[in-house]
């Protein structure tokens, strides 16, 4: 009996000694299978906290002493976090799998603020595109497909689509650049006048938009509650998968508008003063394994920048031109960028005015 009690106590003690890795990330953005595999292999315990807006993560990082070991900043705020000193340099000498990342993605990181590739490692990437219910859109508009930003950003189209429901993500970071792009303006303009033009343009469309929400649209599109949405490519893939999986009769399609769109990147980074920096670097290197990042792509529905992982990604994902963009369409993409805090305030104010139609 004493031996059994001693063994039980030893097991409990060993479990309690497992090193903790505190991650701050989007909800369900790392598959449980991946986390469990890492915990078992490295005798670690992952604490996974979530946020529902990139702005919340950024605010948390800028306050300092967050207590987190790993965060996932996007291309919209990575530059500001680096400039503010909120991130630690990653010891790339410990990332034996870093060579799996396609060079063009490392170049994009340099272009958006990580000039020497010292602070961030690419995780997943995607685009902001149009998702729609083919039958309901045809019934409302007479069109077989939505192919252009004109199919969303025009009063005529929105009036027709209002009857079946149009939604947009609730994020100035994700939608405002698309509005400016459609208007022929710099998607990352620093001019207050350009954001005023966007406000005035959207004032005509606002009455026909059912809601702004960055998560509700997935279920609603899948179930036929709405018929069109501007959303993240991976979220639209999930909506499509739900509709197919439940066999509910909704033919959900996703398309990159013919004019082009914004491409974004979520990255792995280590907060300043992270308690377990070395374990965070082990996790980053673990994610860079082709077989691991492929699990993430197959589960979450987003493309990854790991060239060796592509053969392991499900065919329905890697053959989808709205997710793994064909080379000839890549030139139509513009990368998501950071804005100065001053311009970010202007953009956010304009977005609030659009939503409230003031």
Spans of features found by a protein language model:
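N-terminal signal peptide c-region/cleavage motif recognized by signal peptidases
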Residues: 13-16
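Early extracytoplasmic/lumenal segment of secretory-pathway proteins
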Residues: 19-81
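A ligand-binding cleft/hinge motif common to bilobed small-molecule-binding domains
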Residues: 77-80, 228-249
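Extracytoplasmic ligand-binding site segments that recognize negatively charged/polar headgroups
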Residues: 78, 82-208, 220-222
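A bilobed periplasmic-binding-protein/Venus flytrap-type ligand-binding module shared by bacterial periplasmic
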Residues: 131-136, 181-184, 264-276, 295
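Periplasmic-binding protein-like
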Residues: 195-204, 210, 248-269
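Conserved C-terminal helix/tail region of periplasmic/extracytoplasmic solute-binding proteins
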Residues: 219, 327-358
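Mature extracytoplasmic/periplasmic domains
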Residues: 271-332
